[in-house]
């Protein structure tokens, strides 16, 4: 069964190889604290605290696998995983902090703009894990408050039992064909950070933008919440086409022989960089710093790549041979600070155009 469909048009979109070349050029070093290695003193202090609370929008099973691996490496520390959609996590943390409740130690979000807001509010601690010193400058906060702990792609896809490769959509434009009406499943930007970022990128994309999304909204879309859901609906045959499922969920399902093929659309594919940071007022500051060091380590990042099918900015990880290299995919990208300014507009226009 086809695993990938790659369709590339000669449009002014950034390829991943161009993106990373631009990220890595120059010798600029981000300001803020120097990278902090794991020391025996940090491990001892973390074990005394005994627990770390991790709010994340990573797929639950992957987050639990990460927690288990950390607990095996550092016996005596329990990771409490609180998993939800990125926008729900943002709402929860905002409500908790407004009520002077400080439960969370480490936060991860597929919507990096959330971390920009936490930083503005003074909720994050300036802390740079050891491996983050090797990160591309544009994938870490210049003041050391957060960095990109993972990336994924918001991809098109189709059910290979319901659609033949020759008939499958190859581009976003293809999905406006009347034959796809009532046949597309799509996630929601008000719930999912991945979809918030992808929607922002598409709204700025040449030849697409809000006029395209307005037309898509007339295709009787099956609307779901999380970006983890479209690949699952696709695998079950509830809809033959998905508009914006997570690449990593689709790959995980393909690994189980689910009838899914991924499409990297001709116009470009939204690249969604997540981010993670330590909360300044978290109840377990040492365990938080030890955990986030593990999250960004080669071991932690390799787990996300191998088990979770995510993309990583750690130069020490090994990409699965079966996966299309990021350097071969045209991508759209987002500036988290600019995206953060557009959140309300995205929610308003999406609700207007899609009726949800």
Residue ranges: model-predicted function:
Residues 1-49, 356:
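Short, low-complexity disordered leader/linker segments with a strong preference
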Residues 32-40, 47-65, 274:
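Extracytoplasmic "Venus flytrap"
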Residues 53-67, 79-97, 102-238:
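Extracytoplasmic ligand-binding site segments that recognize negatively charged/polar headgroups
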Residues 113-117, 240-259, 308:
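A ligand-binding cleft/hinge motif common to bilobed small-molecule-binding domains
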Residues 151-152, 180-191, 213-217, 223-224, 256-282, 294-318:
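Periplasmic-binding protein-like
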Residues 155-162, 199-203, 272-284, 303-304:
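A bilobed periplasmic-binding-protein/Venus flytrap-type ligand-binding module shared by bacterial periplasmic
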Residues 301-356:
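C-terminal capping/gating helix-and-loop segments adjacent to ligand/active sites or protein-protein/ligand interfaces
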